Amino acid sequence: MQWYLSVLKNYVGFSGRARRKEYWMFTLINAIVGAIINVIQLILGLELPYLSMLYLLATFLPVLALAIRRLHDTDRSGAWALLFFVPFIGWLVLLVFFCTEGTSGSNRYGNDPKFGSN
């Protein structure tokens, strides 16, 4: 839960770097929260996904900021995040980038998050 909350605290922090662990732990918890919200909507019998849409809006900027910081960790520009808008191929490329180990030591986006804070 600490990984999830730390990303939310850095709500619009687009600079710096994010480790794979931070990215994937946030993504996992985000998916679990989304699933719980969907179950609640089913129980309440909501025809339109109001709660899901509200949650997506609330987490859009933190998810985008985290994705950009993750790209920075691999020494890539945040502009690569535009691949989110290219179905399948773009998502596959981003998946590879997000799974790639970050550059060791400092890079143009900051210090290595494995060895201290940015």
Swiss-Prot record:
Chain segments annotated as transmembrane: 26-46, 48-68, 78-98
Positions in the Cytoplasmic compartment: 47, 99-118
InterPro entries for the chain: DUF805 (IPR008523)
Residue ranges that the UniProt entry lists as topological domain Periplasmic: 1-25, 69-77
PANTHER family according to UniProt: INNER MEMBRANE PROTEIN YHAH-RELATED, INNER MEMBRANE PROTEIN-RELATED-RELATED
Family: To E.coli YhaH.
UniProt protein name: Inner membrane protein YhaI
A GO CC term assigned to this protein in UniProt: plasma membrane
Native source species: Escherichia coli (strain K12)
UniProt keyword Ribosomal protein present: no
Pfam families the record matches: DUF805
Cellular localization per UniProt: Cell inner membrane
Topology within the bilayer: Multi-pass membrane protein
The UniProt record lists the keyword Transmembrane: yes
Keywords: Cell inner membrane, Cell membrane, Membrane, Transmembrane, Transmembrane helix
